[in-house]
C-alpha cells in the first residue's frame, strides 16, 4: 500500500516520500520512461519493474503486514500478492537509503518532458 511504502521510505531515509521522491527523476512516482537519471531514480525504476511482475496484484492499494524493528524492515505473512508487494517496497526503501549520498535536488520535481528515449528493459 502506498501509505505503508511511505512509512518504509521514512524509516530508511528519515524523509517523507512526498515531496522528495514523489516526482523525482524519470521513474519515481506514477509511470516512467527514458533512462533513470541517477541511483535514486534507478531504485524507482527497479521498484516499477518489481510491481510490473505483479500484474494480477493491486500493488498500490493492497495492505500487507510488516514490522520496523532494530533498524530492519521485515515483511510478514499474508497472501502471495501481499508478501510480494511488501518485498518490492522493502527493497526499494533500502535502495533509496543507499542512494541518499547521490540524491540531487535538481531531480526532485523533474518534468516528464525531459525523460526521453526508450525505456530500459527490466
UniProtKB/Swiss-Prot annotation:
Cross-referenced InterPro entries: PLipase_A2 (IPR001211), PLipase_A2_Asp_AS (IPR033112), PLipase_A2_dom (IPR016090), PLipase_A2_dom_sf (IPR036444), PLipase_A2_His_AS (IPR033113)
SMART domains (UniProt xref): PA2c (SM00085)
GO molecular function term, any single one: phospholipid binding
A Pfam family reported for this protein in Swiss-Prot or TrEMBL: Phospholip_A2_1
Biological processes per GO annotation: arachidonate secretion; lipid catabolic process; negative regulation of T cell proliferation; phospholipid metabolic process
Entry-linked SUPFAM superfamilies: Phospholipase A2, PLA2 (SSF48619)
Keywords, alphabetical: Calcium, Disulfide bond, Hydrolase, Lipid degradation, Lipid metabolism, Metal-binding, Neurotoxin, Presynaptic neurotoxin, Secreted, Toxin
Enzyme class: hydrolase
Disulfide-linked positions: 26-115, 28-44, 43-95, 49-122, 50-88, 57-81, 75-86
Active site: 47, 89
Keyword Transport: no
EC number(s) stated in the UniProt entry for this protein: 3.1.1.4
Binding positions (Ca(2+)): 27, 29, 31, 48
Named cofactor requirement(s): Ca(2+)
Expression (tissue specificity): Expressed by the venom gland.
Localization per record: Secreted
Cofactor stoichiometry and binding remark: Binds 1 Ca(2+) ion.
The protein's assembly and partners: Heterodimer of one acidic (CA also named crotapotin) and one basic (CB) subunits; non-covalently linked.
Recorded family membership: Belongs to the phospholipase A2 family. Group II subfamily. D49 sub-subfamily.
Main function: Heterodimer CA-CB: Crotoxin is a potent presynaptic neurotoxin that possesses phospholipase A2 (PLA2) activity and exerts a lethal action by blocking neuromuscular transmission. It consists of a non-covalent association of a basic and weakly toxic PLA2 subunit (CB), with a small acidic, non-enzymatic and non-toxic subunit (CA also named crotapotin). The complex acts by binding to a specific 48-kDa protein (R48) receptor located on presynaptic membranes, forming a transient ternary complex CA-CB-R48, followed by dissociation of the CA-CB complex and release of the CA subunit. Monomer CB: The basic subunit of crotoxin is a snake venom phospholipase A2 (PLA2) that exhibits weak neurotoxicity and strong anticoagulant effects by binding to factor Xa (F10) and inhibiting the prothrombinase activity. In addition, it exerts myotoxicity, nephrotoxicity, and cardiovascular toxicity as well as anti-inflammatory, immunomodulatory, anti-tumor and analgesic effects. Also shows a strong antimicrobial activity against X.axonopodis passiforae (Gram-negative) which is completely dependent on the enzymatic activity.
Descriptive protein name: Phospholipase A2 crotoxin basic chain
Source organism of the structure: Crotalus durissus collilineatus
Amino acid at each position: 500500500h502506498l501509505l505503508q511504502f511511505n512509512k518504509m521510505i521514512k524509516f530508511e531515509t528519515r524523509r517523507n516520500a512526498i515531496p522528495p521522491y514523489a516526482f523525482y527523476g524519470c521513474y519515481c512516482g506514477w509511470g516512467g520512461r527514458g533512462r533513470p537519471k541517477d541511483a535514486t531514480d534507478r531504485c524507482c525504476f527497479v521498484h516499477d519493474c518489481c510491481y510490473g511482475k505483479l500484474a494480477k496484484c493491486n500493488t498500490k492499494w493492497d495492505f500487507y503486514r510488516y514490522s520496523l524493528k532494530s533498524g530492519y524492515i521485515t515483511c510478514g505473512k499474508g497472501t502471495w500478492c501481499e508478501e510480494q508487494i511488501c518485498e518490492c517496497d522493502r527493497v526499494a526503501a533500502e535502495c533509496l537509503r543507499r542512494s541518499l549520498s547521490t540524491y540531487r535536488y535538481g531531480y526532485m520535481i523533474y518534468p516528464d518532458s525531459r525523460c526521453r528515449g526508450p525505456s530500459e528493459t527490466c
